[in-house]
């Protein structure tokens, strides 16, 4: 089993993700190889909450140019985690 800090990279801070907090849904950037069970276990272990649902989205990297050179940013994976009613993650409270 991988460490929870290897699975969860950082929270997603955007207008949409902050709006989802009211519905008890929290968004995280996660490791691209992580599956839903690993994400659920990592959130429950790190934040001491009960996870009801995990949804994942694979986000393709964007094409970038510097002069005549074309490259891409890295592909990422986002997870939207729904918590049991009444549970909260305190780090997101001020958003």
Curated annotation (Swiss-Prot):
Pfam families: Ribosomal_L23. GO terms for cellular component: ribonucleoprotein complex; ribosome. The keyword Ligase does not apply. GO terms for biological process: translation. The keyword DNA damage does not apply. Keywords: Ribonucleoprotein, Ribosomal protein, RNA-binding, rRNA-binding. InterPro entries: Nucleotide-bd_a/b_plait_sf (IPR012677), Ribosomal_uL23-like (IPR013025), Ribosomal_uL23/eL15/eS24_sf (IPR012678), Ribosomal_uL23_CS (IPR001014). Gene3D superfamilies: 3.30.70.330. GO terms for molecular function: rRNA binding; structural constituent of ribosome. PANTHER family: 60S RIBOSOMAL PROTEIN L23A (PTHR11620). One of the early assembly proteins it binds 23S rRNA. One of the proteins that surrounds the polypeptide exit tunnel on the outside of the ribosome. Forms the main docking site for trigger factor binding to the ribosome. HAMAP family: Ribosomal_uL23_B (MF_01369_B). Belongs to the universal ribosomal protein uL23 family. NCBIfam families: PRK05738.1-3, PRK05738.2-4, PRK05738.3-2. Part of the 50S ribosomal subunit. Contacts protein L29, and trigger factor when it is bound to the ribosome. This is Large ribosomal subunit protein uL23. The lineage of its organism: Bacteria, Bacillati, Bacillota, Clostridia, Eubacteriales. The gene is rplW.
């Amino acid at each position: 089993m991988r460490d929870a800090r290897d699975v969860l990279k950082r929270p997603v801070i955007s207008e949409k993700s902050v709006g989802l907090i009211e519905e008890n849904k929290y968004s995280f950037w996660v490791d691209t190889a992580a599956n839903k069970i690993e994400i659920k276990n990592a959130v429950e272990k790190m934040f001491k909450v009960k996870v009801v649902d995990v949804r994942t989205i694979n986000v393709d990297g964007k094409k970038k140019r510097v002069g005549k050179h074309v490259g891409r940013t890295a592909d990422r994976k986002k997870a939207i985690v729904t918590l049991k009613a009444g549970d909260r993650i305190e780090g997101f409270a001020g958003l």
